Amino acid sequence: MNLFKSITFLLVFVAALLAPWAALVADERPRLAVLTDIGGDPDDQQSLIRLLAYANEFEIEALIASAAGTRGELKEGVIRPELIREIIGAYSQVLPNLMRHAQGWPTADYLLSVVKSGNPHRERAHIGAGHDTEASRFLIERIDCGTHERHLNIAIWGGQTDFAQAMWQVKHERGSEGWAAFVKKFRVYDIDDQDGIANWMRAEFPGMNYLLAKAPPGRDKREGTYRGIYLTGDESLTSREWIEKNIRSTGALGALYPTKTHTAPNKYTCLKEGDTPSWFFFLPIGGNDPNDPSKPGWGGQFQRESDGWWRDLPAKDGLDPRDAVSRWRPDFQNDFAKRMAWCLPDSR
């Protein structure tokens, strides 16, 4: 009995010592907010399914449904937060299996609590007085919770209207000093300036740590760095055959993975995930350094322009900017397959 008591005391003592360390590790996970135009091209569902397979690597603080689709894609302005909730529901079914392989997984209830609705309308005309939304207010709240050392990493998969509304509100309510303090607390990876307001934001909201992943002016839009997630390199890893074998066969979460997207000139028309590089960039195991986007990693490689924003590397001397992502495809696809296998009850 004395031995048992001694062992119990030792275990309690060790646990007490490790508790602050465990909390520190959790606190060091990147803070992430996602704005998605889910409800148009189904590649947003693809990207969200992959993200939830890595949910333990982040502190996911916001999942925002912005105006669905790209400009002109849908006949009316809508938001589709229910599609986010559907995927979270599937995640909840495989969560017990995921927890057998790693720690830090958020509960489904927590993820549902950070799903917020944005503006079904987009562009400059819908930014300003009277245009705040649940999403824009929540973004401000989450940014305010951070520091210049603990940024909120904002991945914009669709339009930037709700983000811009949050910026507008803070700048107009807090003045120059308040804005200067606020702008140090976040950084952005924007996929393609989908609402067409990047130039206006750059002038209106100075000092932002902003990465705009988009093909340079005058180039084919399909040459953007982020499109290396599905273009160039070994495209067989984007095929439906690969997806069926490694993703859709792994339980409730993988079963929701869409198999038809707009991938031209990729012949497989299956995996696109055009938004995934935005959060790959902040993923610790992805190799990128968010403090220095010129360094390579799964989220691409970028250069700083004279205006302070980060942009795609130019295509020159035989360099295809998309290769900055596609070169890692064997690595990130193998890792994705491994994590989705964790969703199975008999996985090892």
Predicted stretch roles:
Residues 7-20:
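Bacterial N-terminal signal peptides
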